[in-house]
């Protein structure tokens, strides 16, 4: 959906600057929230975080459908939608990555990580291509497809039966915010 939003922005405004703003609005949340999302993924039920992210994507798709069909979709709405998508993705990706090791055995983890990586790469390549083919029939159809897929993904996440391992609710400190960076740096 993120690529289609950019295409529609360009179709509406014919401005490369506005197209760049869409990319910026989608990227800035990941940068701004990078220290916080790890804390959230570690402290709360990852399934609920994923459902929340998918609900945001579903709602954004509905707004984009309504705006496209109603003829009121413009630059500001697209930028706000891009910011919403970027924020949802900022929480979704790290949460998905943190959930997988909790779902499979230690022995199966390397294969599961390889499969998840292959699936993500396939989706990254095929998603925009398929979206482009659907976009020919109209942007609202792409957003409708994304809305349906979001609901399907929510249903699949709700089927995950993994007890949430509760983390001690220590106060969030600067040290805890930077702990993830320290862990990565030590590797």
Language-model-detected regions and their locations in the chain:
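Alpha-helical transmembrane-bundle signature of multi-pass membrane transport and export proteins
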Residues: 1-187
